[in-house]
């Protein structure tokens, strides 16, 4: 009698099933990673404007614009944020948006970033806000799911 070599059909099917389960777990983790990285990116893009807003407030130039005694925080365009440039003299690239802020700037200015359709579908339309307090400190809050937020940003369902 010859000795058999190789795998049986059932053994091969079990291996394929195990690989399928592992691949589905890895895909879910990757999708969560993509969303978290997009939220962190917008957190940083919006956060960059805090220094410019502080400078404007300290200089007493609270009206947004390019003229004398006006302030332009120079929000950069992002392909995962929606929102038109608030300075009519500045044109941003197509399919990009900028962080929104009030005009005039106040001691409690909010820098608001809204995720557009280029962001992961689970965060479309969600907001991330850097809120200034009268004391001069800033805090972050968002209505994106808490599991996607960095540790310094709090979930806020009211946004």
From Swiss-Prot:
It is found in: Fimbrium; Membrane. The modification N-methylphenylalanine is found at residue 7. Its main location: other. GO terms for cellular component: membrane; type IV pilus. InterPro entries: N_methyl_site (IPR012902), Pilin (IPR001082), Pilin-like (IPR045584), T4P/T2SS_Core (IPR050470). Keywords: Disulfide bond, Fimbrium, Membrane, Methylation, Transmembrane, Transmembrane helix. It is a single-pass membrane protein. It holds the Pfam family Pilin. It comes from the Bacteria. The keyword Transmembrane applies. The chain crosses the membrane at residues 7-29. Residues 1-6 form a propeptide. SUPFAM superfamilies: Pili subunits. One of its GO terms (biological process) is type IV pilus-dependent motility. Disulfide bonds join 56-71, 140-153. PANTHER family: GENERAL SECRETION PATHWAY PROTEIN G (PTHR30093), PREPILIN PEPTIDASE-DEPENDENT PROTEIN D (PTHR30093:SF34). The pili are polar flexible filaments of about 5.4 nanometers diameter and 2.5 micrometers average length; they consist of only a single polypeptide chain arranged in a helical configuration of five subunits per turn in the assembled pilus. Belongs to the N-Me-Phe pilin family. This is Probable minor fimbrial protein. It comes from Dichelobacter nodosus (Bacteroides nodosus).
